[in-house]
Amino acid sequence: MAKNPDPLLPITSDAGVTRTLDDWATVFNLAIVVLPDRPEAAGFVPVIDRIFGTLGDADVRAIVCVPSTPSIADRILGEAADRYLVWCDPDRAFVQSLGLDRLPALVHLRQDTTLVTAAQGWSPTDWQRVTDEIARHAHWTSPKVSGRGDPAPTSGWPA
């Protein structure tokens, strides 16, 4: 079950910038898509583009986290790695701190890094619920999560 993460946990971006979770969340709520470090994760890039295409202009920091190295994250995300803030979590400390069991996951953290809500595995309905909550907190339009050609719903992969 997802839980409040450790706000003092150091997290490194694919560009090599390391800050604590608390520092990353200083100004905005966080919308974080945590992908599995598997080739199948590339199929979720269009979903990420739809979600962050709407929420990217809101007072929400849109982040993709891959529990692996920057080279694996870049291989999974392709050009999308240049569009979003990408966190790399090779030791899975962030994933474990959140208490995630299944990936992919969509996580909403408040500015103080407490958990608002999360969806684990790929259920368009559950992810829509999370994005609706993010949009409500940000006073913003809620993105349409599901789309043609998306991966089939799945319980996901072990975190």
Language-model segment annotations:
Residues 92-95:
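Histidine-centered metal-chelating micro-motifs
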Residues 34-36:
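The conserved beta1-alpha1 loop
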Residues 12, 85-90:
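Short acidic-hydrophobic, aromatic-tinged amphipathic segments that line or gate anion-handling sites
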Residues 1-30, 39, 43-82, 97-102, ...:
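Non-globular targeting/processing and membrane-anchoring segments
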